[in-house]
């Protein structure tokens, strides 16, 4: 459960990263595909090379979904309900991949905003990403 401080910390760090949605989203995906190559299996039709238009486009979708969750931080499940349905029922993404993506996103944020990612902000952002992952996997059966 996100505390008031967590919500403030998450909103604060996203105010710094929102304008870089496509860049950070693509970087996160590229990092995940390299670090955890098994995640590539969900993207057989993608050009997975650095800088590909498909990675940039999907990275922007990922980042925009996170921004949507931040904008509705008191109702993440409502904000991401359709995305949860898509991943659980149509795409059938292994739930562990959301944790891997979250870890890669944390690394990208740390690279670009090292002074802003204090231990407290890191903890809050990690809790937020876990909450998003829980919402996205809530409809799995």
From Swiss-Prot:
Classification via SUPFAM superfamilies: Globin-like (SSF46458)
Origin: domain of life: Eukaryota
InterPro entries noted in UniProt: Globin (IPR000971), Globin-like_sf (IPR009050), Globin/Proto (IPR012292), Hemoglobin_a-typ (IPR002338), Hemoglobin_oxygen_transport (IPR050056), Hemoglobin_pi (IPR002339)
Tissue-specific expression: Red blood cells.
TM spans (from-to): none
GO biological process, one term: hydrogen peroxide catabolic process
Annotated heme b binding sites: 87
GO molecular function, one term: peroxidase activity
Keywords (A to Z) from UniProt: Heme, Iron, Metal-binding, Oxygen transport, Transport
Residue sites binding O2 per the record: 58
Reported function: Involved in oxygen transport from the lung to the various peripheral tissues.
Family: Belongs to the globin family.
Assembly and binders: Heterotetramer of two alpha chains and two beta chains.
Protein's recorded name: Hemoglobin subunit alpha-A
Organism (species): Struthio camelus
């Amino acid at each position: 459960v996100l505390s008031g401080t967590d919500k403030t910390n998450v909103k604060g760090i996203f105010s710094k990263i929102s304008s870089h949605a496509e860049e950070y989203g693509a970087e996160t995906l590229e990092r995940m595909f390299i670090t955890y190559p098994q995640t590539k299996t969900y993207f057989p039709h993608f050009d997975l090379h650095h800088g590909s238009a498909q990675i940039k486009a999907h990275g922007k979708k990922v980042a925009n979904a996170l921004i949507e969750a931040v904008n509705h931080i008191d109702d993440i499940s409502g904000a991401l309900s359709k995305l949860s349905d898509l991943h659980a029922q149509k795409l059938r993404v292994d739930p562990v991949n959301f944790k891997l993506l979250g870890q890669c996103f944390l690394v990208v944020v740390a690279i670009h905003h090292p002074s802003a990612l204090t231990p407290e902000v890191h903890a809050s952002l990690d809790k937020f990403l876990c909450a998003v992952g829980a919402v996205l996997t809530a409809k799995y059966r």
